[in-house]
Amino acid sequence: MKIADLMTLLDHHVPFSTAESWDNVGLLIGDGDVEVTGVLTALDCTLEVVNEAIEKGYNTIISHHPLIFKGVTSLKANGYGLIIRKLIQHDINLIAMHTNLDVNPYGVNMMLAKAMGLKNISIINNQQDVYYKVQTYIPKDNVGPFKDKLSENGLAQEGNYEYCFFESEGRGQFKPVGEANPTIGQIDKIEDVDEVKIEFMIDAYQKSRAEQLIKQYHPYETPVFDFIEIKQTSLYGLGVMAEVDNQMTLEDFAADIKSKLNIPSVRFVGESNQKIKRIAIIGGSGIGYEYQAVQQGADVFVTGDIKHHDALDAKIHGVNLIDINHYSEYVMKEGLKTLLMNWFNIEKINIDVEASTINTDPFQYI
């Protein structure tokens, strides 16, 4: 399996297009033509993680957090430059799966909920998928070759189906004028043509490509076409809602997940004895969604990186919070390893996958 094949597999299961626009995901360092010798999953790509990959003989690291994020202005032999230089020197490919893994139904938040032993887990804050229904009108004799070209270029696909078109027949009218150069008809004469309306669906990212291909392969000098926007609730969403088996107090639940996640500290906001049943989770840094979580029925909102003023606001408004620290996302190392092994087994791919043993939490606790 080459890196390009791995990227295709990852994009199929955890689409990079679902990442936030500000994010930097995908193949950050590497060569698509290189064969994969092994995959190491990591929360962060630190120098220690790179050394671990080298020791194992693995040439691919998949990290959750992008190493190249804010922009690199130099590649000196220190700091981030040292890490990047070592990756390149040892021909190690680096792939980032950040917010696309956050919003995935099997991603980080699902992994956290399962690690906490919760049940009835479902995605919240679902994204809106934007599609377009494309319709254009073409002379009957040109329909076949036109559809062939669109299909060859990846349009009119629905899941595992290609060449997904709908046709309806009718008559078109037009009159070429001025400097027109008509394929059919004569200048200043109204022309009636047996035409077919062709309809097909595309993803939002294919819109400009579809317009280009229609203009390129349509026989008319000035083809008529429409893009009709359609929005649907996506399977992807930032966060999950889940439940404990039996009601617990806020303090007991905080202590329970501290133990299950094996993290050194947990903070919480709210009355210690308040009963907890439904839990909303956004791993990493999810502040800003706590009030939506309450509106959706959560008794407590679990996330990391909670600042003082956000915590105070929540306390004043009676919103329960639990801060499990950003590093709690480390569960994705084993979680992504399991996903990769399952996908590889389905495709009959024999490549070693391991979760990094390196603790990349920058904090020390006393």
Swiss-Prot record:
Annotated Zn(2+) 1 binding sites: 64, 102, 329
Binding site for Zn(2+) 2: 65, 326, 329
GO molecular function: metal ion binding
Keyword field contains Zinc: yes
Keyword Cell membrane annotated: no
Pfam families, per the entry: DUF34_NIF3 (PF01784)
Keyword set, alphabetical order: Metal-binding, Zinc
GO CC terms of this entry: cytoplasm
InterPro entries: DUF34/NIF3, DUF34/NIF3_bac, DUF34/NIF3_sf, N-reg_PII/ATP_PRibTrfase_C
Family: Belongs to the GTP cyclohydrolase I type 2/NIF3 family.
Subunit and partners: Toroid-shaped homohexamer that has a central cavity of about 38 Angstroms diameter.
Name the UniProt record assigns to this protein: GTP cyclohydrolase 1 type 2 homolog
Species per Swiss-Prot/TrEMBL record: Staphylococcus aureus (strain Mu50 / ATCC 700699)
